[in-house]
């Protein structure tokens, strides 16, 4: 599921695809890896 701004969720995990972030496209983000985190219930 996509929440916009590069944020996606699948079951209990969400991640940010930095390639979709405007700041990344603008070259202000240096780390090309996705940012992962778990959803808090």
Curated annotation (Swiss-Prot):
Domain of life, source organism: Bacteria
Pfam families xrefs: Bacteriocin_II
Record key words, sorted: Antibiotic, Antimicrobial, Bacteriocin, Disulfide bond, Secreted
UniProt KW Disulfide bond keyword: yes
Gene Ontology cellular-component annotations: extracellular region
Single biological process term from Gene Ontology: defense response to bacterium
Entry function: Bacteriocin active against S.aureus, S.typhi, B.thuringiensis, Klebsiella sp., E.coli KL16 and E.coli Gj137.
Family: Belongs to the bacteriocin class IIA/YGNGV family.
Protein name per UniProt: Bacteriocin
Organism the protein comes from: Lactococcus sp
């Amino acid at each position: 599921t996509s929440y916009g701004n590069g944020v996606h969720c699948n079951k209990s995990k969400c991640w940010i695809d930095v390639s979709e972030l405007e700041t990344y496209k603008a070259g202000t983000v240096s780390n090309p890896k996705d940012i992962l985190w778990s959803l808090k219930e």
